[in-house]
């Protein structure tokens, strides 16, 4: 069984990856002693920049292993693409707090506050996920997945994390927080990016 290391301490992201990888016989694991490593400052202007930066750095701590780093977030059209790369810390969004994530409830509250006068038909947006795969400090490939949806005016669902309770996927009229792990792997931005990664893995030495 092939093992892939994921450069995150976010249990929600690890669950998402594990759910997508399980049907392919791939083991998902975190980087050993990840919590003791110095965090990589996520100061890139794009998801791609942040994902590549994290993959390069964290892969140096797992010699010979393929390490995948994820940078993802929510882009709301009515907010000119915000929260974007600031999704995890949107409630504070100060440059000197580049690695200080705020809690999901506070981030969701800010999005709802900023959309309070926006009509439903203009509350469109998307989740974006960029994965970067690296080994021994060298980028091997990057993958981008998106999921288009609508931002609700109140949260729904108890699964997931982040902005999942606000993000309604029109094709099935459920928020990402109402999906099973299997459904989320099928429909989500992270699932889309990870499927590209799995296809690439088939030719990996």
What are these regions (language model features)?
Residues 2-5, 11-205:
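Anionic-ligand binding patches
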């Amino acid at each position: 069984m092939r093992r892939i290391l994921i450069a995150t301490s976010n249990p929600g992201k690890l669950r998402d990856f594990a759910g997508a990888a399980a049907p392919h016989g791939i083991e998902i694991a975190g980087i050993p002693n990840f919590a003791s490593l110095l965090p990589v400052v996520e100061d890139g202007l794009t998801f791609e920049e942040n994902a590549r930066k994290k993959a390069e750095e964290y892969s140096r701590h797992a010699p010979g292993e393929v390490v995948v780093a994820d940078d993802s977030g929510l882009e709301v059209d009515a907010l000119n693409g915000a929260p974007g790369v600031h999704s995890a810390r949107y409630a504070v969004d100060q440059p000197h707090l580049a690695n200080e994530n705020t809690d999901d409830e506070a981030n969701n509250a800010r999005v709802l506050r900023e959309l309070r006068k926006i009509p439903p038909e203009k509350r469109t947006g998307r989740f974006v996920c960029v994965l970067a795969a690296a080994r021994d400090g060298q980028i091997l490939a990057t993958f981008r997945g998106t999921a288009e949806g609508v931002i609700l005016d109140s949260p729904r669902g108890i699964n997931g994390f982040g902005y999942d309770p606000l993000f309604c996927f029109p094709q099935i009229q459920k928020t990402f927080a109402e999906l099973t792990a299997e459904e989320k792997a099928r429909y989500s931005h992270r699932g889309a990016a990870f499927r590209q990664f799995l296809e690439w893995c088939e030719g990996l030495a």
